Amino acid sequence: VLFMQGGGTGQFSSTLLNMLAAHAAKHGNNSNAGACAPPVDYVVSGAWSKKAVQEARRLTSRVNVASDMISMIGDPNAEIPSPDKWQLSPVDEYPAMLYYCENETIHGFEFPEHWIQRLPQAYRERVPIVADCSSNILSRPIDVRAHGVIFFGAQKNVGPSGVTMVIVRRDLIVDPDALQASYVPPIPATLVYKNMADNGSLYNTPPTFSIYVSGIGFRKLLLDGGVPAAQERARIKSELVYKTLDVFPHVYRPTVAHPA
């Protein structure tokens, strides 16, 4: 677990660059995978994942939008398409990652629990999955082991803004300066996961107050029953909201289907 800065927007760059480095470290000597930039897959479900794609296109050449839901926004029956309908990069092209945003706060799409198990098995086993969980972290259980990277800004569910927490699988933490792959650009030092991991998140001055207050929030969460209890409280509150909206459909028109 790393404590970084730059918010979720900083991780749009950091996740991509570090995953390209991890790809080069693993596949650099493979003649099929090491000669050119690998594809990176993105699922665009709203404004935040769209911004992540825009940043990726600045930094690498093979950005594949596996599913784009932007055109569906505003349709009250819109739902997240099943992964078997996505245009994922072929596994034999060694994609560097699959990126998605767990919950789009602006446009309303939230991925269902356990959706990753619906991806093709070979894809799940070979491609690191990167999740932006900024707006629903600690609101429900998340399968950390199914992901390569999970990041979240503290300001929505954890504590004050200023700290960004990143959960990284250990085998994906590599030294980008030791690589020879031309498709890995120089990474700013404070965005390198290895720098932060090797220095206990103290590579540069950390946002101490934000970390301290977040710690208070974590302790309170545990005292109140942890994530399962928080999920149940959220369920009760959301049911009240949705039932009220159903009674007064003229007051608010949903932009996506309820399960989304």
Language-model segments: which ranges?
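Active-site phosphate-binding strand-loop segment of PLP-dependent enzymes
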Residues: A56, D68-I137
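A glycine- and small-aliphatic-rich helix-loop capping segment at beta-alpha/alpha-beta transitions
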Residues: L16-G28, R58-R62, Q117, V144-G148, ...
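Conserved beta-loop-alpha segment that forms the PLP phosphate-binding cup at the N-terminus of a helix
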Residues: V1-P38, S49-V53
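Active-site C-terminal subdomain of aminotransferase-like
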Residues: A154-Y242
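Conserved PLP-binding catalytic core of the aspartate aminotransferase-like
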Residues: Y252-A260
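Conserved active-site segment immediately N-terminal to the catalytic lysine
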Residues: V130, V144-Q155, T164
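Substrate-binding/gating loop at the entrance of the active-site cleft, primarily
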Residues: V44-T60
